[in-house]
Regions:
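Anionic, Ser/Thr-rich low-complexity intrinsically disordered regions
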Residues: 2, 19-106
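Sec-dependent signal peptide recognition
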Residues: 2-8
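N-terminal signal peptide c-region/cleavage motif recognized by signal peptidases
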Residues: 14-18
Length: 106
């Protein structure tokens, strides 16, 4: 069951998304940061970044719900597992939210 969950999370996290501002661009520009909750946090306070964060977080929430239902797990547990992977996979110079709650460069 855990291996299925890991595979599904990997597919979720690797799926390409096309927006005016892409997630990769936003990360590279320091406009968003990953969190241990599994959701993006805005670093920049502009409309384009806010819209991207809202879209990505909504899609993630739906995916986390699907994975949780398929594996009989709480949604927040699935989200936290994904968040740990996303923070760990963040590149040097990208923002992540630390355990102190502050967004900082990795």
């Amino acid at each position: 069951m855990k291996s299925l969950l890991v595979v599904m999370l990997a597919l979720l996290l690797a799926s390409p998304v096309s927006y005016a501002l892409t997630l990769d661009e936003a990360r590279a520009q320091g406009r968003v940061g990953e969190t241990f909750t599994g959701y993006l946090a805005p670093v920049a306070q502009d409309g384009e970044t806010a819209a991207l964060v809202a879209r990505i977080n909504q899609a993630r929430a739906e995916s986390y719900r699907d994975v949780a239902q398929q594996n009989g797990l709480p949604v927040d547990e699935v989200a936290k597992m994904a968040g740990q992977k996303l923070v760990a996979r963040s590149k040097p110079g990208e923002y992540v939210r630390g355990i102190n709650g502050q967004l900082m460069k990795k």
